[in-house]
Amino acid sequence: MNQKDRSLFHQKLLELKDGSYDVFYEDKRYLLSKKTELKGKLIKLYADELGDNDFISLNYYSEIGDGLLKPCEMPQEKVIDFVLNLST
């Protein structure tokens, strides 16, 4: 991920409010849960597609390097695309 994409991803992730709520991605509805911990140093995000078995899961450590993204059991590109292209 280049610096511009990293910055955009970080910004979009921070803009998402903590809690659980519906979002849309590729015309599908997901229940997204976001939790910010350790005074903003760790962001946990999980989204479960409603009506199917797709999901998104990631941990993001904002203060490690330029931000360290750790997807859970899926490609980094999948979680980046989800965060950048979801709508609330």
Question: What label would you give each PLM region?
Answer:
Residues 1-33:
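Negatively charged, low-complexity tracts enriched in Asp/Glu with abundant Ser/Thr
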Residues 38-78:
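Acidic, aromatic-enriched beta-alpha/helix-loop junctions
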